[in-house]
């Protein structure tokens, strides 16, 4: 047995499923998950000593690559001053200043510890601010594991074939209206059915938890217009897209202004950080200045803030997003060319530093139904064959891939060459 197999066997006796987040168990592709010993740049190294070109990037945060020296040094320096204080620090102020400068729609920001905390808190705030209970989310989108959001959720819920999670009371779920991504008519129908009851829409601007599905041109502006018409707030969940699709996020890339924004992943530079923020009048409703309660023992943790501050300063440097786009475009085009040579029907969506691979005869993939029609069994074989080639893709047909600026064009070309060999045998 390999070291990964031995560790996985031991882990399953101690940790449910052997992992601390379901998708890591390779449930979506079968087999034994890799146990990782270290990572550097664009590469992961497993406990058995094998190296992989990494397109998971810790599920998005590693936009600069693994073990970036600026982030590593910031963490070491912060740790030497203490691990946690439970009191305000200067770095929290500096971090808030930087985030609000980089994302102009965020007049104010509140730091939390995860993307789930960010979305959960933003929805509570929207409900408290509007005095309404219902929310709209979209089929196949995932916004963390808060009870009100595990209704036809994407990500692991799709992989496990569970559109709803046991343990979510029906009384919670009834306030969550699920519409079709990229379908404005379904959203208007929901508003017309409950014109005075909907507090907010929450949306992944690029759906990254049913692989990678970008919005159609009129979709996000249409959501903004419907929120304005019916007095609801628009929450854009940029946990995945923030600082990746563009410096100011997908909202800037697509030209839509939300009332609230949720951030995670890149904002922590690899540490557990989330944030939500937006209009000043809405944020003023948060405790302690307002009646909507939200709190966290480790929110604004000094080490996490130092990591995030270092990461965002690096991400804000000229050329970062142009490089991400160039690398991702080359990968997407190369995969399509290789698939066509082998007669494999393939769609590759990509935006900025995100991409998605779909085995399908369809010309495009634009919604949950399109994603579910793709050939998952072929993806499973593709995943394992690419893994054998030293390429680590997301171990699920329903998860996006992530590029970093640490990837070289040689890495991309080697990945395309590996895919060409795999397609010939697929």
Curated annotation (Swiss-Prot):
One Gene Ontology term of the molecular function aspect: pyridoxal phosphate binding
Superkingdom as given in the UniProt entry: Bacteria
Enzyme class: isomerase
Principal location listed in the UniProt entry: cytoplasm
GO terms of biological process kind: protoporphyrinogen IX biosynthetic process
UniProt cofactor(s): pyridoxal 5'-phosphate
PROSITE patterns reported for this sequence: AA_TRANSFER_CLASS_3
Catalytic activity of the protein: (S)-4-amino-5-oxopentanoate = 5-aminolevulinate
Cell compartments where the protein resides: Cytoplasm
Subunit structure: Homodimer.
HAMAP family associated with the record: HemL_aminotrans_3
Protein's name according to its UniProt entry: Glutamate-1-semialdehyde 2,1-aminomutase
Organism: Shigella sonnei (strain Ss046)
Encoding gene (name): hemL
């Amino acid at each position: 047995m390999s070291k990964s197999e031995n560790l996985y066997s031991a882990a399953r006796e101690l940790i449910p499923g052997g992992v601390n987040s379901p998708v890591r168990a390779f449930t979506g592709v079968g087999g034994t998950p890799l146990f990782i010993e270290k990572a550097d740049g664009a590469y992961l190294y497993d406990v058995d000593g094998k190296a992989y070109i990494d397109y998971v990037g810790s599920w998005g945060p590693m936009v600069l690559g693994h073990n970036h020296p600026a982030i590593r040094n910031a963490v070491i320096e912060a740790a030497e001053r203490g691990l946690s204080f439970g009191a305000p620090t200067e770095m929290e102020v500096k971090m808030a200043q930087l985030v609000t400068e980089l994302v102009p729609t965020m007049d104010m920001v509140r730091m939390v510890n995860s993307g789930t905390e960010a979305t959960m808190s933003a929805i509570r705030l929207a409900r408290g601010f509007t005095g309404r209970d219902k929310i709209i989310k979209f089929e196949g989108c995932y916004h963390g594991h808060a009870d009100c959001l595990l209704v036809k959720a994407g990500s692991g819920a799709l992989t496990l074939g569970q559109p709803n999670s046991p343990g979510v009371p029906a009384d919670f779920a009834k306030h969550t209206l699920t519409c079709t991504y990229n379908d404005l008519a379904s959203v208007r129908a929901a508003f017309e059915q409950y014109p005075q009851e909907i507090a907010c829409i929450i949306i992944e601007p690029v759906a990254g938890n049913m692989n990678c599905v970008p919005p159609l041109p009129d979709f996000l502006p249409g959501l903004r217009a419907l929120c304005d018409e019916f007095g609801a707030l628009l929450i854009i969940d940029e946990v995945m897209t923030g600082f990746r699709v563009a410096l100011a996020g997908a909202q800037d890339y697509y030209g839509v202004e939300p009332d609230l924004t949720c951030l995670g992943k890149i904002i922590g530079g690899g540490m557990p950080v989330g944030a939500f923020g937006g209009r000043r009048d809405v944020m003023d409703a948060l405790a302690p200045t307002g009646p909507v309660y939200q709190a966290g023992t480790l929110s604004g943790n000094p080490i996490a803030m130092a990591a995030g501050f270092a990461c965002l300063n690096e991400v804000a440097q000229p050329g970062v997003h142009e490089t991400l786009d160039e690398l991702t475009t080359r990968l997407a085009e190369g995969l399509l060319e290789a698939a066509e040579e082998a007669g494999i029907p393939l769609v590759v969506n990509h935006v900025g530093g995100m991409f998605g691979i779909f085995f399908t005869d369809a010309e495009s993939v634009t919604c949950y139904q399109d994603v579910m029609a793709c050939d998952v069994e072929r993806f499973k074989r593709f995943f394992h064959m690419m893994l054998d080639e030293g390429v680590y893709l997301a171990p699920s047909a329903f998860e996006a891939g992530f590029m970093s600026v640490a990837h070289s064009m040689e890495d991309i070309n080697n990945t395309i060459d590996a895919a060409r060999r795999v397609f010939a045998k697929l």
